């Protein structure tokens, strides 16, 4: 299990001095839960966005990547099964999809590039460490966070549903999602078509057990034009 963290740990990106205990504090503490809306080819259910990943940015918007090649695991399905994370795996098989159909290599990429850069997942941050358990924690946390961010439902509640024949004001989409999230979000487009959203968080404590707090984006809020298309999945 991961080590217990003190309750007075500062919120990431809000510390005034360097925090030495990186098992209970993430220096790259702007965490982004990123989601796809894939329509061509489509992935996942027609009434849900899908998981892209969980990314640690530095507080200035830059980001580390591929931080430990020795832990770039290549058997995520086996790891999750061995660690008893069957529910997480089953959920990922529906909601964490690769548009080219190779989910396993997509998961390996997300773990190796981003997961290995989250300091609280370092093997030294565990009591009685079992090899690969930190990867299971990464995927389980990403899934549980994604479940709290139902983009499709939040947009539908604001009257914004996929429609191939009309466009929506980007401001209306931003407003609907930021009101629910508690901070602005980052919206991504392919041309004029909405296809990605990033929810930003800071964390008090570890990734495994800490508190995620909505945070303002650490960069541009959008790559989209003022009016966008939100296409139905094919």
Swiss-Prot record:
Protein name: Ribonuclease Trv
EC class name: lyase
Glycan attachment positions: 15, 75
Signal peptide from the UniProt entry: none
Keywords of this entry: Disulfide bond, Endonuclease, Glycoprotein, Hydrolase, Lyase, Nuclease
Disulfide bonds: 5-24, 13-59, 23-125, 67-117, 189-224
One BP annotation, GO: RNA catabolic process
Family per record: Belongs to the RNase T2 family.
Chain ranges passing through the membrane: none
Catalysed reactions, as listed in the record: a ribonucleotidyl-ribonucleotide-RNA + H2O = a 3'-end 3'-phospho-ribonucleotide-RNA + a 5'-end dephospho-ribonucleoside-RNA + H(+)
Organism of derivation: Hypocrea rufa (Trichoderma viride)
InterPro entries associated with the record: Ribonuclease_T2_eukaryotic, RNase_T2-like, RNase_T2-like_sf, RNase_T2_His_AS_1, RNase_T2_His_AS_2
Active site annotation, chain numbering: 52, 110, 114
Residues in coiled coil: none
MF-aspect GO terms: ribonuclease T2 activity; RNA binding
PROSITE patterns: RNASE_T2_1, RNASE_T2_2
Annotated function: This is a base non-specific and adenylic acid preferential ribonuclease.
Lineage start: Eukaryota, Fungi, Dikarya, Ascomycota, Pezizomycotina
SUPFAM superfamilies the UniProt entry points to: Ribonuclease Rh-like (SSF55895)
């Amino acid at each position: 299990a991961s080590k217990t963290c003190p309750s007075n740990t500062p919120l990431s990106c809000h510390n005034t001095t360097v925090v030495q205990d990186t098992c209970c504090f993430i220096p790259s503490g702007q965490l982004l839960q990123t989601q796809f809306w894939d329509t061509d080819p489509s992935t996942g259910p027609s009434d849900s966005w899908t998981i892209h990943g969980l990314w640690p940015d530095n507080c200035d918007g830059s980001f580390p990547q591929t931080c430990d090649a020795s832990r770039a695991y290549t058997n995520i399905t086996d790891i999750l099964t061995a660690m008893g994370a069957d529910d997480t795996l089953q959920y990922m098989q529906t909601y964490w999809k690769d548009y080219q159909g190779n989910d396993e290599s997509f998961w390996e990429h997300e773990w190796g590039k981003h997961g290995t850069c989250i300091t609280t997942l370092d093997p030294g941050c565990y009591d009685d460490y079992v090899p690969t358990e930190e990867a299971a924690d990464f995927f389980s946390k990403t899934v549980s966070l994604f479940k709290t961010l139902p983009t499709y439902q939040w947009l539908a509640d604001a009257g914004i549903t996929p429609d191939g024949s009309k466009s929506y004001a980007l401001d209306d989409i931003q407003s609907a999602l930021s009101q629910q999230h508690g901070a602005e979000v980052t919206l991504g487009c392919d041309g004029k078509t909405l296809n990605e959203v990033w929810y930003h968080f800071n964390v008090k404590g570890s990734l495994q057990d800490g508190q995620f707090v909505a945070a303002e984006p650490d960069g541009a809020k959008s790559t989209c034009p003022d009016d966008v298309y939100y296409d139905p999945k094919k």
